[in-house]
């Protein structure tokens, strides 16, 4: 039996419409399933654990955005229970890395016909991440964008976030320790990635792989504020590695230290001074 964990608010209610499509298709195929709804942050993790403990579940399916997929993944870590993803959020970034379909019934077809395969999960201090973490200009823009979404919709919050991010930009001074080697610099962007995309499809780590047993570190050096508008479009188009002032490394462990930094962890912002990243190879089973 498949358990579908649905976040009703995902995609401004789009997840509920997808739920009806999934119910109809599962009924048409005469396949046993159950649907449960999340009602608070972290609830999807609890529901995933309950599905595993039930002893009757053969797979747990996330119906929501990247946040729902991440929470469900946390509940399935190292259990062998496979995760399926039916995208229903606004970003749906992780599915792009692993090549999953965006259309709901096509995603369901993958779940019903493909054998699960292992993917890596990132470790960060005492928590996990599935996709991308980082600090710098992009996180500043994300913070302003999230604030703008409280009073406007569509593309306007992103435009407001970008303009305010440029207006208030300051370089982030970061000390890195990468596989034992330490250096310091002022950065525009510092991203640690298991996946390739963030922010609704921006390829911040375009060469990352979710099943290579490594993390990708992309660092864009600090540039003066007046130059930022010239780099925004190439960044949005996924050309970050084309900049001569961008460095890219693959590694097993990364430590970054920057007092008072804001860290993006799979789309959520957390204040901290120090972050230690590791990779957990093949820790999650995924239909893909």
Located regions from the model:
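ATP/nucleoside-binding phosphotransfer catalytic cores, i.e., glycine-rich phosphate-binding loops
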Residues: 15, 178, 184, 209, ...
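Gly/Ser/Thr-rich active-site loops/lids in small-molecule metabolic enzymes
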Residues: 149-157, 201, 206-227
């Amino acid at each position: 039996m498949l358990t579908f964990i649905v976040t009703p608010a995902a995609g401004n209610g789009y997840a509920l419409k997808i739920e009806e499509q999934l119910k109809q298709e599962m009924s048409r195929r005469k396949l046993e399933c159950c649907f449960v709804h999340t009602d608070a942050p972290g609830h999807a993790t609890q529901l995933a654990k309950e599905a595993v403990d039930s002893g009757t579940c053969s797979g747990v399916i996330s119906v929501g955005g990247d946040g729902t997929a991440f929470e469900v993944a946390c509940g399935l870590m190292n259990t062998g229970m496979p995760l399926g993803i039916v995208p229903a959020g606004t970003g749906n970034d992780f599915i792009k890395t692993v090549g999953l379909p965006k259309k709901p019934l096509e995603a369901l077809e993958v779940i019903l016909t493909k054998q699960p395969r292992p993917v890596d999960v990132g470790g960060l201090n005492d928590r996990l991440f599935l996709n991308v973490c980082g600090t710098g200009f992009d996180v500043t823009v994300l913070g302003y964008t999230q604030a703008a979404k409280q009073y406007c919709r569509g593309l306007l919050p992103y435009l407001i976030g970008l303009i305010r991010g440029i207006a208030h930009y300051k370089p982030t001074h970061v000390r890195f320790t990468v596989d034992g080697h330490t250096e310091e610099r002022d950065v525009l962007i510092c991203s640690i990635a298991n996946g390739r995309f963030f922010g609704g499809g921006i390829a911040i780590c375009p060469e990352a792989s979710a099943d290579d047993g490594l993390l990708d570190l992309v660092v864009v050096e600090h540039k003066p504020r007046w130059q930022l508008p010239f780099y925004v479009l190439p960044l949005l188009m996924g050309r970050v590695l084309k900049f001569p002032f961008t460095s890219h490394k693959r590694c097993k462990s990364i430590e970054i230290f920057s007092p008072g930094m804001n860290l993006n962890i799979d789309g959520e912002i957390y204040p901290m001074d120090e972050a230690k990243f590791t990779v957990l190879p093949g820790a999650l089973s995924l239909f893909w």
